[in-house]
Amino acid sequence: MAVYTKVYDSYAQAESSVRDLEAAGIPSADISLIANKYVSEQYADVSDVSATSTGAGLGTAVGGGAGFLAGVGLLAIPGLGPVVAAGWFAATLVGAAAGAATGGLIGALVDAGTAEPDAHVYSEAVRRGGTLLTVRTNAASAVQIDGILNRYQPIDPAVRRREYEQTGWREFDPAAKPYTPSQAELDRIRRR
């Protein structure tokens, strides 16, 4: 099974992709989303954040934008803080967080087939307010899924890496503090 991973600058872009994937018959069980907690506060009624800063577990959340996101969990990931986590990849990430030596989000992305340099960019993009979307698929659906995911302008990891490097960034640092909503918005404005 192939895994497609994209990061969007806004939750709305990712949500549109999820809706189109579901409309195309992609099972919700094969779709996963990870976004900063502040995004969840805009789109879901977050009722509890019980995960620790080391990524030890899931909290609870109620509501959600896209249908499959109802009942999403909150997961604390080093360098990202609390994130909204829904779907199969979130479960993979919980396992990676429990065995901290596996590398957290970067390790989970690499294990799912993402090149390590791109995994660093994707992790940094989520830290800065982006939304990560992963989809599992068989070969028969690959072209369709790729088209849907690219429809809503996901980031280009090579371009984004160059933008980040212009500010002195080299790779994702799990010890770095997560961006606040205002920092994330300023970062988006700077890149426009």
Q: Where are these predicted regions, by residue range?
A:
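Intrinsically disordered, low-complexity, hydrophilic segments
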Residues: M1-R192
